[in-house]
C-alpha cells in the first residue's frame, strides 16, 4: 500500500510492539533514577495563604542577588541554585505581601512551602494575567494563549452564562462556526482537530445545548491553556491545537464556596480540606432550568417539551508527605432534548483521571496518569409506524508517564510514554416492535496508539534559547471487526468485492510516524524578542460530518485501511514587544500549516447508519496561512486587548469541487476583536466586547428545477464560492460588587446585553418555495395557493438579548 512521506504502514506482531514498550518503560525508569547529582538546589512551592491555590509566576530570588532569580511554574513550584548558607530567600508576587525566610543548608533536603498573604490593591495594581509581566518576551512558547479565569468571568456573556470556549473565540487565530456555537477552528483546522482535555483526560464533545455553551464551569477551573502551535512533545493526537483545562485544588484550610443564579442556569462550587490539611476537595455542579420556563407556555405542545443540561465535576487531592501528591478528577455532563414525547435526544460525557506526582530529588520529577473518557448519545423516536432507538458510544482509556530531569540551570529534559486505547462502539438502531424500519448494527472499531516522547529545553546564552522535542507514535487498528475490500483499493458505494473478519485484538492495520518539534527564542533586549517554531502532529481519529458547528450525533472515524491519519506540519515566526514597563504587550505571529489526509464528504453522503463509511468520504490535502496581531493592556483601571487576524484556509480533494481547491466553510479571512474591562471603583466595573469577522463560506444554488410542481434548488459542482454577510456584534456588561471588608458572604450582580445593537447575523439560509408572497404561508393549513416562486429564507438566532446573574462567595 502506498503512503505519504512521514508515516508508513508496517507489519509488526503485537508481541514485538509490547516488547518495545516494555523495554522503553524499563529504560526510562532506570534513567529517571540513575542520573548523578548536579549542583545542589533549593526547591519549593508558593501558595495563596487564603485559598491554598498555587501562585503562578511568583518571583523567587536570594536577597541582594536578583539576577539569580526564578519564577514559579504552573503548580507554584520552583528550583533555585544554592548559595552560601545561611541566606535569605525572597518570595514576591504582585498583590501579595512579600515573604523573606532564612534558609539553612539542611533545607535543601526537603521541599519548602511558602504561603503569601493577599494585600489590599489599588486600582492601578489590578492585573489580568496569572503570569509574570515579561512572560511573552522571555518564554519559548509560540502560539500559546492563556486566559485567566477572572478575565473569562469579566467578559459579557450570552444568557449571563460565563463560557470558556466563547472567551477563547476572542483570541487571534481562533474562528467560530457562527452565531450561538462554541465550536473552535484554530489556524485553519476543523473542530475535530482540537484536543480538549480536562486534567489530562480527553473530552470528546465539549459543548452543551448543541454548541451554545461549553461543558466547563469556570468556577471550578484553575487555568486554561490554548496551544495553537509549538505543542510540547508530551502532547499529541490532534492536528491543530490543544486546549488544556485544569480543575482547581481545594482549599486546605477552610470550607469555601461560590456560585451564581442566572437567567437560564445556576451553579454551585464548594471546596475545602478533606481529611485535615494534607488533603482537599473541590466539587462543582451546574444545571439549567430552561425546561421549567417551557412549562409556563400557553402552548400545550411546548409545555410537554424538555430541554436541559447539567454537569458535575470534582477533584480530590492527597499530599503524601513532602514528595508525593495523589489526585482524582471526575466529570459528568449530560444534555436532553424531548419534543412532546415523540422525540428524545440525550448525550453525555463521563471523564475521570488519577494523577500521581512525585519529587524524586531536587532535580528529578515524575508524573503518572491514568484516565478514562466516554461519550455516548441516544436518539428515541416514539412513532407507531417508524419508531426506533438509536445508540452510539465511543471511549478512550490511557496511561501516561512523564519524567522530568533538571540537568543544570541551562538544560532540562523530559521523556515518557503515552498509551491510548480507542473503542468506537457500533451504531445500533433498534426498531420498535411494530415499526416498519429494519435493524441496523455497524461493526465496532478499535485502535491502540503507543507513543514515546522526548523533550529538551536548552538556554545557549541569556539571549538564545531552544526547545526541541520528538514524539513517535505506533498506531494499530485491532479487532474485533470486519474490513471490506474494493477494486483497486478505492472505496465506492455498492462496490465492495469481499470482506475479512478479524478476531478480538487481531491486528488489522498499522501506521507509525515521527513528530519533530522545534522552537527558538532570541532576546533582542529585555522588552523585545523574536521566536520561530516548527511542529508536526499526527491525528488518528476524525469526524465525518456535514455540519461545521458540530452535532451530538457526529460520526467519529478511526484510522483504518482506507482512512489514513492526518499529518499536520506548521511553521511560525513571531515578534514580541512590551512597552511602558510591561503594561502593554504587542505581538505579531505569522504561520503556514500543511495538512495531509484530511477528509470531506462526497456529494449526497450518508454517514450515520452505514457500515461502510469509507465510501461516503474522500481524503486529500489542505493548507492554511495567516498573520495574527495582538495588542494587550495588562494593568490599570482599563484592561483588555485588540486583535486582528488575516488568514486563509484551503482544501483540495480528488472528487470534490471538480478536483479544484476550495475554501472550507470556516474560512473567514478577516477577524477583528476588541475586549475591554474597566474598574470604576471596588464596587463597579464594566465590560465591552466587539467582534467583526468575514462571513462563512457557503454554496448557494445557481438555479432550480421542478419536481412534482415544486422548485428544487440546483447546486453547482464547485463548493463554497459564496459567503454569508459579514458577522459583527457588540456585547456589554455592568457588574456591581458588595465590597464591604470583613464580610464572609460576598455578592455581585452582573447585567449583560448580548448583541447590543441588535444585529441580525445569519445562522442559516433555506431555499424553498414561497407561497402567496408570504414566507410563513403553509399550504396544508392556510388555504389555497395563489402564487408560488422559489425563494430564500434567512434564519437568525438572537437580536438584543439582556440577562442578569447574581454571583456569590462565602
Give the location of each predicted region.
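Transmembrane beta-barrel wall of Gram-negative outer-membrane proteins
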Residues: 262-287, 300-336, 344-366, 372, ...
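Gram-negative outer-membrane beta-barrel transporters
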Residues: 591-594, 613-702, 807
